[in-house]
Amino acid sequence: MAIVKCKPTSPGRRFVVKVVNQELHKGAPHAPLLEKKSKSGGRNNNGRITTRHIGGGHKQHYRLVDFRRNDKDGIAATVERIEYDPNRTAHIALLLYADGERRYIIAPKGVSAGDQLIAGALAPIKPGNALQLRNIPVGSTVHGIELKPGKGAQIARSAGASAQLIAREGVYVTLRLRSGEMRKVLAECRATLGEVSNSEHSLRSLGKAGAKRWRGVRPTVRGVAMNPVDHPHGGGEGRTSGGRHPVSPWGFPTKGAKTRGNKRTDKMIVRRRK
């Protein structure tokens, strides 16, 4: 990984900071593991905008990533290559299993082409191997953590993400997440050892608005720049500050208001995030 600052040969290049990884595969992705990905422009079946700031962008294919890793226990796999994935911040690794099947997984940090990986209860403790949490030593760093056994990884999947296994008690283990939250998870759930690759992703700078448009992100208009019919902060003679505490276009408090409402899983949280 290398952080590259572009020379200011044009206004659009002046602030560009790239993360360059020479190990990334330069060819096409593995075709059998691709699926069509259609664009909605943020509209639903009625043609109405349900998610703002979506539209345009380069055409993409979805890579089918194996988040479960539960039906290849004991079958060794060789990392064929590490690839870029436009659908996520992390890189993905193409595995070739001993039975001849190929699958994508989230690429762990430090894993490169030619490495051997395996999943299952007897897998050695090394980055990239997937085990049940009850078989992972206390103090280990893990990612791709399930919340329900067999459902597939849900926690710590983005670039540089990880959690630390800090305790094991009965049928539960306790994890410390990057947010500072400490949470109980069933020991039957699976996780992958190590942290997610591409941890330098947060250091990049796109440099210009057009680079966001290439990614399918449209501009965000401030509420105070709108008319009263469009936003609670809109209207007024001349420039105004909105005249009230910040709210969304639908009048709900924003900028710090708590939105968590899942009381059913409150019992699994040992300590709230910072």
UniProtKB/Swiss-Prot annotation:
GO terms for cellular component: large ribosomal subunit. SUPFAM superfamilies: Nucleic acid-binding proteins, Translation proteins SH3-like domain. Gene3D superfamilies: 2.30.30.30, Nucleic acid-binding proteins, Ribosomal protein L2, domain 3. SMART domains: Ribosomal_L2 (SM01383), Ribosomal_L2_C (SM01382). It holds the Pfam family Ribosomal_L2. Residues 263-274 have a biased composition (Basic and acidic residues). Residues 28-54, 224-274 are annotated as: Disordered. GO terms for molecular function: rRNA binding; structural constituent of ribosome; transferase activity. Keywords: Ribonucleoprotein, Ribosomal protein, RNA-binding, rRNA-binding. It comes from the Bacteria. GO terms for biological process: cytoplasmic translation. One of the primary rRNA binding proteins. Required for association of the 30S and 50S subunits to form the 70S ribosome, for tRNA binding and peptide bond formation. It has been suggested to have peptidyltransferase activity; this is somewhat controversial. Makes several contacts with the 16S rRNA in the 70S ribosome. Part of the 50S ribosomal subunit. Forms a bridge to the 30S subunit in the 70S ribosome. Belongs to the universal ribosomal protein uL2 family. This is Large ribosomal subunit protein uL2. It comes from Pseudomonas fluorescens (strain Pf0-1). The gene is rplB.
